[in-house]
Design a protein with these regions (language model features):
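Conserved protein kinase catalytic/activation segment
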Residues: 376-387
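Short Lys/Arg-enriched alpha/beta "domain-start" segment
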Residues: 1-46
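Exposed beta-strand-loop-beta-strand "reactive/processing" segments of non-cytosolic proteins
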Residues: 34-79
């Protein structure tokens, strides 16, 4: 099976996508006027087992579009399945079949409702033919095509004589996706999760490179990456525009999809914590387990990737002050606390200054998760905690996402998550989150092998936790005003000197 360059989407198809894209949950730009500009398109072959007769086979096309607007220049992936508009009628009971067209992707679940119909789709599809347009991330024909063209860590084996390692039976697109689209494929390679990336980063995606490096280390706390799809282009395809000058060695490749093992019986960490909070059940033991796993993750990352120099304390505090000042000017609630916030940074600077004269007293910069919270971990009775989604902030360049950072920033992300779980789960009192935080931090510190002393680690965690809480106050005030009290309570607690 091959992946090949093909024609860009037609103007008729782009008109359809212009209306459809902004309504998607994963669409990365909200409330900002942007243009959708076709950039690159790739055609995929559909395996014979995933289609009907060859004349009726669907077309699978991956379109990369640039989103251009005031201060916006992003790339999104739009995988599409194009089916002939006069396909055979669906069998009784087929759900969401477009205009009487039966799903053409074999044993997988029927695709969702189509985007619409076009006479000219571009992307190598025959002009003048009526095409029914589907979101490829929700269509089995696209799943089959992605699996067939992906690079596999090892060739998938069938489960037995006559079985298909690419069995799409029971496959379903998940409805909870946020920045990407996820598909559960229980019949593929023993059970897998296919992630179709939406906001595309130029360069190696850390959600591929980091889990692969961890798996090579033998670290079992991450779902094993099994396959991935990467595309490339040459210099003539580089996006043109202001600020787009590229160094000769700049990457001209991007990952479009990732297949990882499915953690059977696992539960989302945030949902689990909310359930415990709602029942008034202590989360301390699970929080302590998570602290140990996170310390082990950071140690594995230090083994797998280069470790930098110790953080410059003066630079760090100056950067945190800068971010803090931006938050204070953006929030009236924080503005009323400006004096206390400034005093907090003064105290932090003084604490860290006292240790800068001691060699290696401050933690070294290293590869980290970068966007860690309880929603990025899974828990299963058989496996314990698994860490997911090393992609980082999808809208930031890969070079920024993979820049060495403080491991304690990941710690601060989990610490902040406990407050949200307590609030969303309606914990009976503040003690629930206090106990969870204390158990998590104590277990992390005991298991951590970075060699940072308690006082320094505590000061850094407090500083990084306040930094995150300040960001959350601004975010909630703009997007979910009813939630603003959650991070604001943490700000007050930290300013008062409490953990």
């Amino acid at each position: 099976m091959t992946l090949r360059r093909t024609d860009l989407p037609s103007s008729e198809l782009m008109t359809l996508l212009d209306a459809w894209l902004p309504e998607r949950r994963w669409y990365p730009v909200k409330g900002v006027a942007v243009r959708h500009v076709p950039w690159l398109s790739f055609a995929l072959d559909v395996p014979a087992t995933a289609g009907q007769d060859p004349a009726r086979d669907p077309r699978v096309v991956l379109h990369l579009l640039r989103l251009l607007g005031d201060g916006v220049d992003l790339v999104v992936q739009v995988p599409l399945v194009l089916e002939p508009g006069d396909a055979s009628p669906a069998a009784p009971g087929d759900a969401h079949t477009p205009g009487g067209a039966a799903p053409s992707a074999g044993p997988g679940r029927a695709p969702a409702a189509p985007l619409g119909r076009v006479r000219d789709a571009g992307g190598g599809a025959t002009a003048g033919t009526a095409w029914v347009v589907h979101d490829g991330a929700a269509h089995p024909a696209c799943w089959a095509a992605l699996l067939a063209v992906a690079d596999w860590e090892t060739t998938p084996a069938a489960g037995g004589a006559g079985t298909d390692p690419f069995d799409l039976g029971g496959g379903r697109a998940l409805s909870v996706e946020q920045s990407n689209s996820s598909v559960l494929l229980p019949g593929v390679a023993g059970g897998t999760m296919l992630k179709v990336l939406r906001a595309i980063a130029i360069g190696p995606n850390p959600d591929v490179t980091i889990p692969r490096a961890l798996a090579a280390q033998g670290w079992a706390g991450v779902p094993r990456p099994l396959a991935w799809l990467e595309v490339g282009w040459d210099a003539t395809d580089d996006p043109a525009g202001p600020g787009r000058a590229r160094a000769p060695a700049a990457p001209r490749a991007a990952h479009l999809a990732i297949l990882s093992e499915f953690v059977d019986g696992a539960r989302d960490g945030f949902d689990l914590a909310c359930a415990y909070a709602g029942q008034g059940s202590s989360f301390a033991d699970l929080a302590a387990d998570l602290g140990r796993v996170l310390a082990d993750l950071h140690a594995a990352l230090r083994r797998a990737f280069d470790v930098g120099s110790p953080v410059d304390a003066r630079w760090l505090v100056a950067d945190l002050r800068r971010r803090s000042d931006e938050a204070v000017t953006s929030s009236s609630a924080l503005g009323r606390r400006a004096t206390e916030i400034a005093a907090f940074w003064d105290r932090t600077a003084a604490r860290l200054a006292s240790v800068t004269r001691v060699p290696d007293a401050l933690p070294r910069l290293q590869t980290v998760h970068g966007d860690l919270h309880l929603g990025q971990v899974l828990h299963a009775r058989r496996f314990g905690w698994k860490v997911l989604d090393f992609e980082g902030e999808p809208l930031r360049p890969v070079a920024e996402r993979t820049r060495p950072d403080l491991a304690l920033r990941d710690v601060a992300g989990i610490v902040r998550s406990f407050d949200y779980a307590a609030a969303v789960g309606r914990a009976p009192d503040a003690a629930w989150a206090v106990q969870a935080r204390a158990a998590f931090l104590d277990a992390y510190e005991r298991a951590d092998t970075a060699g940072v002393d308690h006082a320094t680690s505590e000061a850094l965690v407090r500083a990084l936790t306040l930094d995150k809480a300040l960001y959350e106050v601004v975010y909630e005030s703009r997007n979910r005003p009813d939630w603003e009290p959650i991070p604001l309570a943490a700000v007050d607690r930290l300013l008062a000197g409490n953990a």
